[in-house]
């Protein structure tokens, strides 16, 4: 009965999110595999040269642009972080993070799932040039994790899906904080003040409930540039922009007009093809329905497929390719061990222990419909770090520490693969065990 209530509580938005993210995760995985194959084939020189190709335009003696790799990591990934920011804002206002009672359990789980992997990595790499990579195993890739859960289907309780999504959203928020605090260097305060000025204008637009997305996006480009120049990673600008996008629906609701249009359409005669009148009515319905959506919903709906089926797969293809040959030094400090143990051991232990202790201390309450063994299974799947871990590895290790970056990427792929396989087998066995007991 509790599971039925939980399933009914799962909003349509959340269900669509599960679907898009899970299929996006499969596509993401295929691109990561393709990158590894190409990076270790006769095409490897062309593959690595491609990402250093400059793209932009020349103005006199000045070149305005970036390498293809920077376009992906700094510009396209900003759109991905914009979508993450929109998701976080929605969950904070209306979703599973909207109240302390709802949010406390997954948020504490996310904190434990970030601290434990970070500590394991740092302990193994303390006092080495690679210690700065402690943020790498802290992240969870929700697309991959949900892809695994969707493959398991009904064997996974709906309540566990909700918990994992909420945990991943809180984890994303934590990763953003980690990037802002620990992977920011050489701050330029003049540019930072410029960014704050843009944020102030965005806040005024939000306060006035300006519903057109155009001024927000134009100011967002300016904010991105200021933040990029300030020394803070530019993707943080996208998250700030997301929090400034209005979420209120219009007061002059179009419901009555939609009903009237629906009645008009029902009264028209049906044929093989739509008549001109029917096309006009449907076009009006589409416009009125769009007007009912908040700017946040419209932007999120627009970005979801672009992010899931273009930006993330392209990021995976550009970053997952590592040439594994005799020249690579797998013994760079303890990077390989730190990342793999952080993802495969630190994530499940951190999530399980901190939630178990917090419930015993009556700080939080476990969601109905899932047991402690389910929480451990979610912890195993949370060890699939891939996308965000790859992103943080690019920030943690510069070109001067290329060996560590390459080893970290191999470790992320191995750790994520191990976590995904063990997590899937574990939840499958858990379901079988429950079925036998019945």
Swiss-Prot record:
Coiled coil: none annotated. GO terms for molecular function: sodium:proton antiporter activity. It is a multi-pass membrane protein. It is found in: Cell inner membrane. InterPro entries: Na/H_antiporter_dom_sf, NhaA. GO terms for biological process: regulation of pH. Belongs to the NhaA Na(+)/H(+) (TC 2.A.33) antiporter family. This is Na(+)/H(+) antiporter NhaA.
